[in-house]
Each structure stands twice: as C-alpha cells, then as structure tokens.
C-alpha cells in the first residue's frame, strides 16, 4: 500500500450537487430555491431569533438574575487540600504561592470536605463549623 494509491471505497463518496446546470440535472433554473421570495435571493435570510416582526421570544420573557462582581474574588478550599501544603501557617498569600487559589482572590473559605492529617494554623481565612472542628481535632488552630 502506498499513499499515492489510496482511494475511498467504491460508492462511499457521492459527487457534490451542481446547482443551476440545466433541467436534466434536476437542480437547474432556480437551483432548488423555488420561485422569488426572500430565501430565493442572494444573501436573503433572517437573523437568528427573528420571528417576522413578532416580538421575539427572548424579548417576550422577563429578565432574571445577575452575576455578582464580588463573587469572582471569593474561593473555597477543601480540607484535604491543606494536607499538601508545606507551610504550617496558612494565609491568603501562602495559598496563592502554592497555586491553590488564583492571584486575584481576596477572600477564602475552608470547607469540610475530605480529611486533614496535619496541624495547620489558619490566619485571616474563614472556615465552616465542620472544618474548624476538624482542624482543631488535628491539633491546628483557627485565628
């Protein structure tokens, strides 16, 4: 087998439709577009969501909700992620240094997901009630 001898299987490829090439082709004269009207013209079609002048669905329905801008600067850390930290004292900066949170994060909350094996000291970081109990049980403290 050589690359220059490769060919598709017989009957697997069909020739493209050749429009406007005479009556005998089956797609002559109007090229399958019918007679007149917007869709028969070149460039003639409506934009997505256009309903012929009727008020479109996305404008008939009420607006709802919004995304809080401050939410972008809040992150959650799971308990088991604190096991991987080399530092004993955990602050916002240490979490950023170890790549656990993005650089633009301003507040962090530790949630009780997974287990913590080592004693860590949280400074300036919020945590849930369950996470606080788990950290103190492991010998750490929350400040």
Curated annotation (Swiss-Prot):
For this record, the Gene Ontology CC terms, alphabetical, are:
cytosolic large ribosomal subunit
PROSITE patterns attached here? RIBOSOMAL_L15 (PS00475)
The UniProt keywords, alphabetically, are: Ribonucleoprotein, Ribosomal protein, RNA-binding, rRNA-binding
Query: What are the recorded Gene Ontology BP terms?
Result: translation
Task: Specify residue ranges for compositional bias: Gly residues.
Answer: 21-31
Identify its protein family: Belongs to the universal ribosomal protein uL15 family.
Q: NCBIfam families in the record, alphabetically?
A: rplO_bact
The subunit structure is: Part of the 50S ribosomal subunit.
Q: What is this protein called?
A: Large ribosomal subunit protein uL15
Give the species.
Francisella tularensis subsp. mediasiatica (strain FSC147)
Organism taxonomic ancestry: Bacteria, Pseudomonadati, Pseudomonadota, Gammaproteobacteria, Thiotrichales
Gene designation per UniProt: rplO
